[in-house]
Amino acid sequence: MANNNNHLVIMAGGVGSRFWPMSTAEKPKQFIDVLGVGRTLIQLTLDRFEGICNPENVWVVTNKAYADTVAEQLPDMPRDHILCEPCRRNTAPCIAYVSWRIKSKDAKANIVVSPSDHIVMNNDEFRRVVKQCMKFTGETDAIVTLGMKPNRPETGYGYIQADLSTSSPRNKEIYRVDSFREKPSQEKAMEYIRNRSYFWNAGIFIWSVSTIVNAFRVYQPAINRVFENMLPILGTEKEQEEIDKHFPECQSISVDYAIMEKAEEIFICPADFGWSDLGTWGSLLVQTKKDLYGNSIIGENVNIYDTHNCIIHTLGHKRVVVQGLDGYIVAEEDGRLLVCKLSEEQRIKEFSAE
């Protein structure tokens, strides 16, 4: 049974342009059934928090253009918990916004913040880890981030270095953060793997509402003032008008730079539950089931011949035949077709520019 003070914040404002043609500005990947399982990524995100947060304590921060889509795909959450950014200002301002909104309703709230477009293969382990972290933040003034145990020298993720010499007396699986590191070179990523104290930064945060609000007061007073000054109108009909007016005043900055790298009581819980940020087609190939020839096929009517190490993605009943390819992306969505070498996928944004 979920704790009534547990709140879930889903960040759902991104575009996911590297996942073209499936993901577009009109319908980003978080609103698409990427895995071909009958559930979109944002629906799968909510599913994995079952038993942790009640539907009435779910919040989504998104773009105005996606508000109706969120309401359609997550019908059990309160419509007034869909918070709309008038413009993109990275993650710190929107986390400050939703934190003050939650505080206005539940001063004892314990919050977990999650991206909307990641995948987790082991939901049971995920829930176990999140529950123990929420217990920890409910008893302390700590900020906890989840660190994924790396299984390859990945250069596309930021890393977190943990001080593994001593765990928290309250929880033997939680350690102090030593440092945050930018996306590394291949050589540096290999060094991180050998060191074993470095973990992928998954962008999943856990804190009490009082802890995160106080952190914004101390480390980002300008951003904090924008939303603290709006406290009397949060949850009223005037909220969106005032947000539209004052949200653009906020500095565009990530919560990692704004809070995580400045605050003192920062902890990490190393975890391994089959996580991926699904940032690229290649990451989808890594995470999905493959045939004997290394192909990942998501689609109901796909035939392949002499084809190896490809990802083929087409939803619906369209027939797709692929012959003689090795290491390619073949993806079709709503009349748009991509055939691209996996080794060149970093250029998809360039290819898809209109």
Question: Where do the language-model regions lie?
Answer:
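General beta-strand structural signal in soluble alpha/beta enzymes
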Residues: 60, 83-84, 113, 144-148, ...
